[in-house]
């Protein structure tokens, strides 16, 4: 076979190619990388005072804020000279933060800092390194928001076992879900990862909340179909998953608990249900290091599966009792949704599409009412 390559030159060319292949990942490794926050992430705000109308406090901080953790890598691991800011994206709520000098620490090969960001979004978060007046490195992520985050737990009515796959209709898509097994945030379109193949109520709830709260909304859903309170025992795998998801989220406004049908089937007494849920909440709160309310829904009807008025009433009375128990607050009574709100035998046999939207409305009323509860009521949770 004829070749036009001189042997010595061929070796040099091969070595040059090898060096290029090796150098490419090395060059990429030399580039700074932003680890947190991530795109679509919603960080729970603090300092929100709904009793102060924003129009009466235009320059105040009654809408709240978050000290957003910044984590990134940079080859030199230099801690001096870093700045960060936020930029309002189109139609965003909130207030932009101008370039701010960061106090940076280094640990485990990463750089760590934080930036106080007012409630709102979407934002683009930017990070840069300055040497005098020269920008030597720059990073950014979008969209990110500071708003309201809710952890969802329970069984199939909370998960993806309802008739219609709902999509977020909020124009800027400011309703997201934490894919906690993969540590990423996504738009909260059904089906949501891990919780069933079909529809939920949560996209519709987010659509209702965002324009009223004027912040993005995030959901973390750990519900599992066909589970009773005994399935969520604190020494079991479902509780462990819930704890993991909560730890990864960091902070959230409340736990939305939609569950009860399997306890109706098992014949759980009101006393047992009450005691179990108190233990589940108490243990979770201690593990998370948080003290947030749980809003249990009255969720006992399952018309295509059973008709057990006595057992249903036992669970309803337990939830009624929990609503007045410190650490718990009233969720919705979704048992009010019967008839056309439930799918028939040839469907998913949970909420129909209209039922999903009405359940979302009931959840909205509960959350909105809770956010605006009198300040004096907060002492009742202690």
Q: Residue locations for each model-derived region?
A:
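Bacterial N-terminal signal peptides
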Residues: 14-24
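N-terminal secretory signal peptides that target proteins for export/translocation
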Residues: 1-11
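Cell-envelope and extracellular/periplasmic
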Residues: 30-382
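Exposed, low-complexity/repetitive linear segments and helix-based recognition motifs
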Residues: 11, 27-28
């Amino acid at each position: 076979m004829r070749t036009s390559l001189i042997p010595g030159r061929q070796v040099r060319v091969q070595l040059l190619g090898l060096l290029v292949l090796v150098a490419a990942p090395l060059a990429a490794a030399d580039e700074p990388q932003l680890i947190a926050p991530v795109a679509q992430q919603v960080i729970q705000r603090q300092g929100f005072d709904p009793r102060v109308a924003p129009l009466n406090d235009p320059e105040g901080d009654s809408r709240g804020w978050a000290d957003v953790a910044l984590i990134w890598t940079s080859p030199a691991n230099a801690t001096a000279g870093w700045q960060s800011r936020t930029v309002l994206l189109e139609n965003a709520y909130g207030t932009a933060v101008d370039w701010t000098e960061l106090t940076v620490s280094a640990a485990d090969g990463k750089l760590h800092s934080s930036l106080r960001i007012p409630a709102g979004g979407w934002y683009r978060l930017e990070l840069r390194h300055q040497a005098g007046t020269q920008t030597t490195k720059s990073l950014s992520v979008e969209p990110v928001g500071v708003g309201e985050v809710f952890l969802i737990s329970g069984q199939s009515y909370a998960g993806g076992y309802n008739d219609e796959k709902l999509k977020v209709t909020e124009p800027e898509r400011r309703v997201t879900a934490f894919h906690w097994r993969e540590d990423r945030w996504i738009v909260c379109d059904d089906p949501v990862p891990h919780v069933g193949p079909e529809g939920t109520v949560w996209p519709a709830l987010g659509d209702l909340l965002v324009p009223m709260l004027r912040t993005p909304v995030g959901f973390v859903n750990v519900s599992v179909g066909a589970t009773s309170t005994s399935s969520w025992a604190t020494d079991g795998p479902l509780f462990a998953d819930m704890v993991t998801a909560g730890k990864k989220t960091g902070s959230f406004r409340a736990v939305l608990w939609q569950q009860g049908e399997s306890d109706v089937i098992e014949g759980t007494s009101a006393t047992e249900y009450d005691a179990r849920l108190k233990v589940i909440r108490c243990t979770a709160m201690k593990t998370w290091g948080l003290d947030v309310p749980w809003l249990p829904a009255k969720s006992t009807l399952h018309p295509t599966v059973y008709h057990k008025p006595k057992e249903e009433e036992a669970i309803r009375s337990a939830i009624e009792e929990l609503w007045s128990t410190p650490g718990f607050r009233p969720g919705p009574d979704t048992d009010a949704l019967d008839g056309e709100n439930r799918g028939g035998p040839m469907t998913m046999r949970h909420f129909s599409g209209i039922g999903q939207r009405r359940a979302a409305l009931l959840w909205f009323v509960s959350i909105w009412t809770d956010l605006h509860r009198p300040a004096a009521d907060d002492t009742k949770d202690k």
